[in-house]
């Protein structure tokens, strides 16, 4: 028998570590002949665009390099499977290609939308009595997947955000003139990444002085009042803002295949608003894609956990017969920090709202 693995959605510093975990654990099973990598997510399965990972991951050095390489080495996609009840043509193509290569288990590394694909494929296989296991491996820097304690990729992105904010804060203080620096951080529905900037306060750093999250109502009037109030105490005001806050700049009607709005420009919008109403020196900084794949500052814990959860997915399918589940973290203790890994019911994840901060 053979297995296949694919990556989907936005890249991270840790997603290839999960791929390495799948590969390493699958190699331990004598019954597995080939470990296929699907190029560009589920599209690679549909188009029969597969590579044999055993032909490229030959030495231990190859695998260690993969574990520490950012982005998605197999490529990604944002392809949305239709409901099989409406159109099952893609499901039939996937089934045919799995049969062609004797693939009996499929592992999909991704976020909310990838888990939607896992659930749909598993349901189709069950309804048609097809013995193929499908297991999801979580990935998202937004940290908004329900039920799991956190997601691989978030730790490294949060570390990048906090470190970059610390450097911006130091840069902003060199001049005597008043200034406002607005840093736009990713997070469409949840503000975990933006909130991670406040870890600097644990060491007595007051900045960022203002933090705005999509979980809270946003008022331009209150924002301007906040900036004026803080500027009376600090000459260099630092604002951390999530791209998903509800302001004029975020109300685009353009969406992707999954119905998600394209977000951009919140920082620039607030820069112009601040300049028009307050008049001090203002600049906005959009961290954009840089926060996703900052391997130079990746979290070792994040990389290790990403590997572990990829390996656990293989055991869930091949050792325990699990399918239609996503592997997730469960917090065991905070001090010392310990987490366990367990399968989570994808139907519960699918009907749940994104995990958001309680503010």
Locations of the language-model features?
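Short, ordered loop/turn segments at secondary-structure junctions
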Residues: 8-10, 38-44, 78-79, 111-112, ...
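N-terminal phosphate-binding or glycine-rich loops at protein starts, especially the Walker A/P-loop
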Residues: 1-50
């Amino acid at each position: 028998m053979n297995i296949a693995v694919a990556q989907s959605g936005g890249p991270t510093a840790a997603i290839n570590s999960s791929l390495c975990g799948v590969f390493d654990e699958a190699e331990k099973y004598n019954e597995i002949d080939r470990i296929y990598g699907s190029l560009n997510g589920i599209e690679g399965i549909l188009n029969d665009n597969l590579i044999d990972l055993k032909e490229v991951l030959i030495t231990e050095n190859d695998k260690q390099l993969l574990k520490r390489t950012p982005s998605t080495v197999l490529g990604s996609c944002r392809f949305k499977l239709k409901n099989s009840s409406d159109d099952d043509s893609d499901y039939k193509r996937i089934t045919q290609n799995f049969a062609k290569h004797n693939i009996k288990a499929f592992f999909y590394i991704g976020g909310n939308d990838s888990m939607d694909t896992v659930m749909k494929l598993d349901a189709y296989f069950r309804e048609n009595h097809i013995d193929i296991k499908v297991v999801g491996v979580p990935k998202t820097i937004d940290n908004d997947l329900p039920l799991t304690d956190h997601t691989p990729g978030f730790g490294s992105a949060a570390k990048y955000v906090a470190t970059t904010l610390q450097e911006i804060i130091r840069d902003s203080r060199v001049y005597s003139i008043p200034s406002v620096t607005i840093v736009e951080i990713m997070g469409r529905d949840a503000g975990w990444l933006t909130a991670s900037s406040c870890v600097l306060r644990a060491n007595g750093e007051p900045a960022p002085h203002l933090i705005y999250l999509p979980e809270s109502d946003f008022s331009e009037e209150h924002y301007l009042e906040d900036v004026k109030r803080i500027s009376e105490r600090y000459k260099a005001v630092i604002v951390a803002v999530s791209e998903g806050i509800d302001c004029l700049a975020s109300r685009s009607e353009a969406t992707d295949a999954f119905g998600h709005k394209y977000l951009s420009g919140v920082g620039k919008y607030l820069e112009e608003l601040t300049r028009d109403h307050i008049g001090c020196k203002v600049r906005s900084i959009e961290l954009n894609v840089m926060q996703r794949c900052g391997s130079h500052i990746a979290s070792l814990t994040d990389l290790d956990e990403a590997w572990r959860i990829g390996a656990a997915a293989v055991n869930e399918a091949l050792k325990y017969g699990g399918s239609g589940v996503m592997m997730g973290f469960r917090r065991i203790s905070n001090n010392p920090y310990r987490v366990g890994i367990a399968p989570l019911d994808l139907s519960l994840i699918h009907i749940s709202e994104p995990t958001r901060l309680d503010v």
